[in-house]
Amino acid sequence: MKAGIHPEYHMIKVVMTDGTEYETRSTWGSEGAVMNLEIDSKSHPAWTGGNQQLMDRGGRVSKFNKRFGGLGL
């Protein structure tokens, strides 16, 4: 790799929606930073089979449903 052009990796803590924590290497944040996930593999319908509702962050889901809810599939 070319020196001086790649971001530095460091250890961060990731906190999943159920409170589970793990450490990983990342270029996000700084050494020891904490990343709190809003949606992860335990809460996203794509991985849970669609049994759970998505949390409506900032009204985006409501706005989508209002606009396209009547289409039906």
From Swiss-Prot:
Among InterPro entries, the record links this protein to:
Ribosomal_bL28/bL31-like_sf (IPR034704), Ribosomal_bL31 (IPR002150), Ribosomal_bL31_A (IPR027491), Ribosomal_bL31_sf (IPR042105)
Q: Which GO terms describe its molecular function?
A: rRNA binding; structural constituent of ribosome
Reply yes or no: does the keyword Cell inner membrane apply.
no
Do the record's keywords include Transmembrane?
A: no
Q: Which domain of life is it from?
A: Bacteria
Keywords of the record, alphabetical order, are: Ribonucleoprotein, Ribosomal protein, RNA-binding, rRNA-binding
User: Which residues belong to the signal peptide in this entry?
Assistant: none
GO terms, biological process: translation
Q: Which GO terms describe its cellular component?
A: ribonucleoprotein complex; ribosome
Name the family the entry cites. Belongs to the bacterial ribosomal protein bL31 family. Type A subfamily.
Q: How does it assemble?
A: Part of the 50S ribosomal subunit.
What biological function has been recorded for the protein in this entry? Binds the 23S rRNA.
Q: What is this protein called?
A: Large ribosomal subunit protein bL31
- Species name for this entry? Rhizobium johnstonii (strain DSM 114642 / LMG 32736 / 3841) (Rhizobium leguminosarum bv. viciae)
